[in-house]
């Protein structure tokens, strides 16, 4: 019998608002993204659980770091959405401090999945996330989300431009993704599961 993919085993574990409250370290992959970029929808698609991550019509609603257990040794981590203008400055500052410290100091973090809206990639805050994470030397996989809203020529152009702009970052990879059409879901899942269990990684098709 084929083992159930690791991502499909996800279930809620805990939420934390302070760095000191983080659970004991395990191998983990963090999902980050600008508010309303489609992060929660991406998590729900990749785990095949429609309501695992909270989706809201009000960007910036998720203010906690949410941990989802995959196995006894691994977590999927949903980081607070960032960059929504209506969030009070003091709340925004708290989020930014928590995010930067988590990304830079969480030793068990295997990699970061950074979700960007394919129509507006590499915003200043997206770049800030990359800068915070760069000193760790750990991999970043960018999902250019909502790709279904672009024409085929726009998809190709956007992917090429983002790859060119990040060409000097050896630890960064990029792909197109759509939670609605499921474009790129298998590619992303293979990448993430490879980070969590390299010895058990399934080779990407083709």
From Swiss-Prot:
<feature type="domain" description="EngB-type G">
    <location>
        <begin position="25"/>
        <end position="198"/>
    </location>
</feature>
<feature type="binding site">
    <location>
        <position position="62"/>
    </location>
    <ligand>
        <name>Mg(2+)</name>
    </ligand>
</feature>
<keyword id="KW-0717">Septation</keyword>
<keyword id="KW-0342">GTP-binding</keyword>
<keyword id="KW-0547">Nucleotide-binding</keyword>
<dbReference type="GO" id="GO:0005829">
    <property type="term" value="C:cytosol"/>
</dbReference>
<dbReference type="InterPro" id="IPR027417">
    <property type="entry name" value="P-loop_NTPase"/>
</dbReference>
<keyword id="KW-0131">Cell cycle</keyword>
<dbReference type="GO" id="GO:0046872">
    <property type="term" value="F:metal ion binding"/>
</dbReference>
<keyword id="KW-0479">Metal-binding</keyword>
<feature type="binding site">
    <location>
        <position position="40"/>
    </location>
    <ligand>
        <name>Mg(2+)</name>
    </ligand>
</feature>
<dbReference type="GO" id="GO:0000917">
    <property type="term" value="P:division septum assembly"/>
</dbReference>
<dbReference type="InterPro" id="IPR006073">
    <property type="entry name" value="GTP-bd"/>
</dbReference>
<protein>
    <recommendedName>
        <fullName>Probable GTP-binding protein EngB</fullName>
    </recommendedName>
</protein>
<keyword id="KW-0460">Magnesium</keyword>
<comment type="similarity">
    <text>Belongs to the TRAFAC class TrmE-Era-EngA-EngB-Septin-like GTPase superfamily. EngB GTPase family.</text>
</comment>
<comment type="function">
    <text>Necessary for normal cell division and for the maintenance of normal septation.</text>
</comment>
<dbReference type="InterPro" id="IPR019987">
    <property type="entry name" value="GTP-bd_ribosome_bio_YsxC"/>
</dbReference>
<dbReference type="GO" id="GO:0005525">
    <property type="term" value="F:GTP binding"/>
</dbReference>
<dbReference type="InterPro" id="IPR030393">
    <property type="entry name" value="G_ENGB_dom"/>
</dbReference>
<dbReference type="Pfam" id="PF01926">
    <property type="entry name" value="MMR_HSR1"/>
</dbReference>
<keyword id="KW-0132">Cell division</keyword>
């Amino acid at each position: 019998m084929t083992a159930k993919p690791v991502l499909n085993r996800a279930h809620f574990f805990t939420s934390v608002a302070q760095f000191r409250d983080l659970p004991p370290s395990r191998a983990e992959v963090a999902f980050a993204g600008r508010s309303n970029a489609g992060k929660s929808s991406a998590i729900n698609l990749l785990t095949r659980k429609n309501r695992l991550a909270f989706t809201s019509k009000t960007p910036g609603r998720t203010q906690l770091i949410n941990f989802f257990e995959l196995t006894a040794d691994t977590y999927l981590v949903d980081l607070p959405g960032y960059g929504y203008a209506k969030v009070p400055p003091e709340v925004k500052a708290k989020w930014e401090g928590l995010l930067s410290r988590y990304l830079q100091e969480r030793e068990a973090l295997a990699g970061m999945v950074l979700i960007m809206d394919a129509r507006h990639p590499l915003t200043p805050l997206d770049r800030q996330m990359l800068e915070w994470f760069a000193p760790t030397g750990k991999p970043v996989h960018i999902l250019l989300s909502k790709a279904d809203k672009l024409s085929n020529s726009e998809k190709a152009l956007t992917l090429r431009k983002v790859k060119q702009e990040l060409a000097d970052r050896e630890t960064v990879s990029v792909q197109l993704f759509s939670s609605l059409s499921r474009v790129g879901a298998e590619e992303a899942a293979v990448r993430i599961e490879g980070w969590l269990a390299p010895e058990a990684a399934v080779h990407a098709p083709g």
